[in-house]
Amino acid sequence: MSAADTLAAADPAAGPSTRRAPAWVPSTRLLRSELRLVAGRRRNQAGLAVLAAVPIVMAIAVKVSRPGAAGDGPDFFGSITSNGLFVPLAALGVEITMFLPLAMSMLSGDAIAGEANIGTLRYLLTVPVHRTRLLLVKYLSLCIGAVWGVAAVAVPGALIGVALFGTGQLTTLSGDQIPFGAAVWRVVLVMLYLSAGLAGLAAVGLFISTLTEQPIAAAIALMIFTIVSWIADSVPQLGWLHPWLVVHLWLSFGDLLRNPIEGANVTQGLLVDLGYAVVFWLLAWARFSEKDITS
């Protein structure tokens, strides 16, 4: 069922004679129907299950493995056994590079291109729903989807981590310790920071989704954009470009685990995310507002 079908079912008697409701009511109904559509797709449910499985597998692997000498891996992995909250942090560090962007690619590909591909976009616009409002709802649903994706990693990771490795004071990257309640709050801040980064990437995906009627093509294009961004970020000769890459400061979420928090990179990262969100949403709006809906 598409968003158009869901919206029509929610208001079957809508017509010219129906009393006009306040502007925010249909917008809220459309958002709810869009979220139900996103949450109800089996592909999305399977994707969330895969995201949630990674921290569980990591925690079990660390639990059953023999302790050995520290290697060159992230500090989060070496600290997992000391506090279960390092499990979601380590899992987020792994999944933010590929799995979470892949999830956002699939969601953003379905946003506009998916509706056009199955022939419901034109009907959705005759409900009536203004194109600008529709695009805002689509992007807001992608932002909520980003939070869902990050939570699908962090929440199971925290639960399995606490169950296997316990709680207690968390040793920050600065070397001192903070109580468990403060540590949970730091994990929440990390979740919000990474969700903001994925929301910036989702704006790029939404723009790409307005350029085609093939959702798979839109998803692949966004993944190519993400991979190229990571590659460019790893090339020292392109240092002048690094501050402008949406992925450049994603891994700076470690600064939120220092005491006190080092906010310079985090603030810069949020500003870059906001810039991507504004610029690419406006590009999507410019394209979508003039798009000839033929399907």
Enumerate the language-model features and the residues they cover.
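Junction motif at the cytosolic side of a transmembrane helix
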Residues: 2-10, 207, 211, 272-295
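Secretory targeting signals
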Residues: 3-21, 52, 56-106, 136-202, ...
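Membrane-interface helix starts
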Residues: 35-51
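Transmembrane helix segments
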Residues: 57-67, 212-248
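Hydrophobic/aromatic residues in alpha-helical transmembrane segments
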Residues: 104-108, 156, 204, 224, ...
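Transmembrane helix boundary and interhelical loop/hinge segments in multi-pass membrane proteins
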Residues: 105-123, 139, 293-295
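A structural motif at transmembrane helix-loop-helix junctions in multipass membrane proteins
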Residues: 111, 187-226
